[in-house]
From Swiss-Prot:
Residues 487-513 have a biased composition (Basic and acidic residues). Transmembrane segments: none annotated. PROSITE patterns: HSP70_1 (PS00297), HSP70_2 (PS00329), HSP70_3 (PS01036). Residues 523-532, 606-625 have a biased composition (Acidic residues). One of its GO terms (molecular function) is ATP binding. InterPro entries: ATPase_NBD (IPR043129), Chaperone_DnaK (IPR012725), Heat_shock_70_CS (IPR018181), HSP70_C_sf (IPR029048), HSP70_peptide-bd_sf (IPR029047), Hsp_70_fam (IPR013126). Residues 588-601 have a biased composition (Gly residues). This is Chaperone protein DnaK. Keywords: ATP-binding, Chaperone, Nucleotide-binding. Belongs to the heat shock protein 70 family. The keyword Nucleotide-binding applies.
Length: 625
């Protein structure tokens, strides 16, 4: 049965989180591993198994080449794929694997199927990246009800129980992206006034700074470049992330990686002390990159720093002391610490899911488009139709004309960005309008219309007012996925889910078979008096059948289950004989006809078929283990 819950998902660069509305409040869902966040990591093992989340992260050092991290940084990149043993995966497919695990864990938590979700994206994601995220959700088998900006979602989690009018600034530094948004809150209305950011700045870059420092120091000391060793590099990455986290609460940490490499003389170890001061000097250029977007967002909103009532920090990277110091320096006030930076976005997404599902009333979300949208006109100029920070959904149109006499076609090239020359912005898509009646240049009237829906997805149309000819395009993101491609990827995702289920079944069948053999041998040894030669021979033959299938690498799971069932049936005979002998002993024991255990006692006249199946009881105990 499908749940009516709409899942709120924070699909992060480093970690993801998910939540639902429960009793009027958003609640984080604990995943299958018992954690409140799930690493956004996917791995493929040598035997073809696919791991997602913590299991994938835990084996990354042993399997660096087939472990994929931070795929979010490549969303919307048409040319990027991951090659695993000759099979190529798009960022949408890898993200869908993470979303599949989230969906499965949520279903286990709720006890029902989950079909619908609200997924968050960085506020500064362009249209391609948003569409790619939506495609990933569909590949994972989710109906994506809404794409919501992460800072907006965080503000919803912050303001759910506060009806006062206030202006907040959300400073969101995640694993791979940085966003800053200014919002006006009040009376259940969440209005984004301005947003800015950097899609290529995040906690991963702080990790990379430590990795660079470690690799340089080690090369200077030992003449070995650890970056050329994939396994050593993975160990550096894990150590860098751990050191960054430790330095948020300590002034100094020791990075100790024994046996990091080897020379002809033997193993070489890595050990360096890193102080917080040194770490902050290594990353000063990174934290400084957050200043300009923050100041620009304030300027675009028409506010000064004194107009901001509260500053909300979002993203695990905001736990770094240098972030707190920089925010106070820019805005002159201490950030709010009542919001969990790892969970706020998922909680806000769940609230938006509650709004869409009718569980939450009196909340209105007014988001904005982060970048200007327009087309290329004569001379390669970028003509804006929708300005950045326009509240969505929205639509705008403008009349254009031809540049040459007797021109019968025009090419409409759609761009997103803030540069004056079209080619310096992001090309989202293009199409051709044909069938324009020949006329002098400047005569035809061609209406170009832009429409942005509530997910920030763009539709563009062009119509020749004279002939009525029209064309339109929905800007596709990522690899430009068609419905057929999404369907194909959904089938592949479902196929992998079936493969995982079949692999689990095979392991369970093997475990059950080995357990049955062990139980059989124990029962034969402990119940010699209850087993005649014929039954012993039958059981031993059944044991041999099971062992033969266990040793046969080509045997199917069905075969293994069949021979195990045959052995279990033979073992039932031992159980029946044990109960029969026990009943007979009780019937003929001391106490006479009316005493305990006598003719009128329990079991005196019972038929063997009335006894509980002994082996079935043993099976249940084994299953519980």
């Amino acid at each position: 049965m499908a749940s009516n819950k709409i899942l709120g998902i924070d699909l992060g660069t480093t970690n993801s989180a998910f939540a639902v509305m429960e009793g009027g409040d958003p609640e984080i869902i604990v995943n299958a591993e018992g954690d409140r966040t799930t690493p956004s990591v996917v791995a493929f093992t040598d035997d073809g198994e696919r791991l997602v989340g913590k299991p994938a992260k835990n084996q990354a050092i042993q399997n660096p080449e087939h472990t994929i991290r931070s795929i979010k940084r490549h969303m919307g990149d048409d040319g990027y794929t991951v090659d695993i043993e000759g099979e190529e995966y798009t960022p949408e497919q890898i993200s869908a694997m993470i979303l599949q695990k989230i969906k499965r864990d949520a279903e286990d938590y709720l006890g029902d199927e989950v079909e619908k979700a609200v997924i968050t994206v960085p506020a500064y994601f362009n249209d391609k990246q948003r569409q790619a995220t939506k495609d990933a959700g569909e590949i994972a088998g989710l109906e994506v009800e809404r794409i919501v900006n992460e800072p907006t979602a965080a503000s919803m989690a912050y303001g759910l129980d506060d009806e006062s009018n206030q202006t907040v600034l959300v400073y969101d530094l995640g694993g791979g992206t940085f966003d800053v948004s200014v919002l006006d809150l009040g009376g259940g209305v969440y209005e984004v006034v301005a947003t800015n950011g950097d899609n290529e700045l995040g906690g991963d870059d702080w990790d990379e700074a430590i990795i660079d420092w470690l690799a340089t120091e080690f090369k200077n000391d030992h003449g070995i470049d650890l970056r050329e060793d994939r396994q050593a590099l993975q160990r550096l990455k894990d150590a860098a992330e751990e050191a960054k986290i430790e330095l948020s609460s300590r002034k100094e940490t020791t990075i100790n990686l024994p046996f990091i490499t080897a020379t002809d003389s033997g193993p070489v170890h890595l050990e360096y002390d890193l102080t917080r001061a040194k770490f902050e000097s290594l990353t000063k250029d990174l934290i400084d990159r957050t200043v300009e977007p923050t100041e620009q967002a304030l300027e675009d909103a028409g506010y000064g720093k004194d107009d901001i009532d509260d500053v909300i920090l979002v993203g695990g990277s905001t736990r770094m002391p240098q972030v707190l110091d920089k925010v106070e320096e820019i805005l002159g006030s201490e950030p709010k610490k009542s919001v969990n930076p790892d969970e706020a976005v998922a909680l806000g997404a769940a609230i938006q899911g509650g709004v869409l599902g009718g569980e939450v009333d009196d909340i209105v979300l007014l988001d904005v488009t982060p970048l200007s949208l327009g087309i290329e006109v004569k001379g390669g100029l970028f003509e804006r139709l929708i300005e950045k920070n326009t509240t969505i959904p929205t639509e705008e149109s403008k009349i254009f004309t031809t540049a040459a006499d007797n021109q019968t076609t025009v090419q409409v090239r759609v761009f997103q960005g803030e540069r004056e020359m079209a080619e310096d912005n992001e090309l989202l898509g293009e199409f051709t309008l044909s069938g324009i009646p020949p006329a002098p240049a400047g005569t035809p009237q061609i209406e170009v219309g832009f429409n942005i829906d509530e997910n920030g997805i763009v539709n563009v149309s062009a119509e020749d007012k004279g002939s009525g000819n029209a064309e339109s395009i929905t800007i596709e993101g990522g690899a430009g996925l068609s419905d057929d491609e999404i369907d194909r990827m959904q089938r592949e995702a479902e196929q992998h889910a079936e493969e995982d289920k079949e692999r689990r079944r095979a392991v369970e069948a093997r475990n059950e078979a080995e357990g049955a053999v062990q139980r059989a041998e124990t029962l034969l040894e402990e119940n010699e008096e209850n087993v005649d030669d014929e039954l012993r021979a039958d059981i031993e033959a059944a044991i041999e059948d099971v062992e033969a299938v266990l040793e046969d690498d080509d045997a199917s799971t069905d075969e293994l289950e069949d021979v195990t069932e045959d052995l279990s049936k033979e073992l039932q005979e031992i159980g029946k004989r044990m109960y029969q002998q026990q009943a007979q002993a009780q019937a003929g024991g001391p106490g006479g006809a009316g005493g305990p255990g006598g003719a009128d006692g329990p079991g005196a006249d019972a038929d063997p078929e009335d006894f509980v199946d002994a082996d079935a009881d043993f099976d249940d105990e084994d299953d519980d283990e």
